[in-house]
Amino acid sequence: MADLAQVTYCGLYCGLCSQRNRIPPRARALQEAMHKDGWELWGPGIPGFEAFWSFLGGLASSEPRCSCREGRCGPPFCGIRKCAQEKGIEVCAFCDDYPCERILGLAKGYVTLLADGQRMRAIGIDAWIQEQEERCKTGFAYVDIRCEPYEVPDK
């Protein structure tokens, strides 16, 4: 069985989240550039700098700690997670009701979600995860193509 640690119940891949694959390296690069320019020495004289520097350090050193499966990512009230757990479904794409109203709502913001779900069903979860790992290597993040805000019904 596949390691689903980076696969959400709805069918997103955590490695394609900018909070995992984009923000920490960019924060590290900014922190390093500012360090090289001496900001640690003269920045504290600027109001709010210490809070900013601390926040930047946190972003730069952040490790992925989120986990949909453990309820540490996404809204704590996520109806998709709750539904999948109640049905004993590992990923919604394998549910007989896929795509349901909740998934269709989420797909308005994550435009690859439905195609990814169909692909997952066609090739299996293990091969799909490998494809997502390759996708990660390109630098792609879901936010690159998010086209509109989404709302997931609570039902």
Regions found by a protein language model. Name each.
Residues 60-72, 129-155:
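Short flanking/linker segments adjacent to small metal-binding domains or redox-active Cys/His motifs
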Residues 1-91, 98-128:
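Hydrophobic scaffolds flanking metal-cofactor catalytic centers in soluble metalloenzymes
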